[in-house]
């Protein structure tokens, strides 16, 4: 994990396997502490990261890696998780996407799912407002 001194952006790239969601959860727990999120926000962020990984890794396409970027916006923190897909899509992803969106929106105030041309989610942005 590397932090840029000027942009306050943190990034992490892990293999595209669900086992590495634990690495993402652990890293985001550390980021939450560094960025002064409260315990509830940290728990919600970590749970949302699990759900986002599950969504990205079950889009009917093979995933080589998941890229996580954290951007500190001062009063907010945005975590983007993006799948690096390869190969053709095997199945429809609409059902998984709807379920994931519903779960994510119960955990995080602002959620954006970005789809590739084939309709599968390729990036999920999670934005939390920092406690004052």
Regions picked out by a protein language model, each given a short descriptive name:
Residues 1-47, 91:
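Bergerat-fold GHKL ATPase/HATPase_c domain
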Residues 1-11, 55-132:
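Conserved beta-strand-loop-beta-strand hairpin that lines the nucleotide-binding pocket
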Residues 31, 49-53, 104:
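Long, contiguous hydrophobic alpha-helical segments, chiefly transmembrane helices and signal peptides
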Residues 38-63:
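Conserved ATP-binding N-box helix of the HATPase_c
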């Amino acid at each position: 994990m590397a932090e840029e001194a000027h942009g306050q952006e943190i990034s992490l790239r892990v293999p595209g396997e669900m086992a590495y969601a634990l690495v993402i959860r652990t890293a985001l727990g550390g980021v939450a502490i560094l960025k002064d999120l409260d315990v509830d926000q940290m728990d919600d962020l970590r749970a949302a990261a699990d759900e986002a990984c599950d969504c990205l890794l079950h889009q009917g396409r093979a995933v080589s890696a998941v890229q996580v970027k954290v951007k500190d916006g001062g009063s907010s923190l945005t975590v983007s998780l993006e799948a690096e897909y390869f190969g053709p899509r095997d199945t429809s992803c609409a059902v998984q996407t709807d379920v994931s969106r519903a779960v994510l929106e119960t955990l995080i105030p602002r959620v954006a799912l970005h789809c590739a041309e084939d309709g599968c989610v390729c990036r999920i942005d999670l934005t939390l407002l920092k406690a004052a």
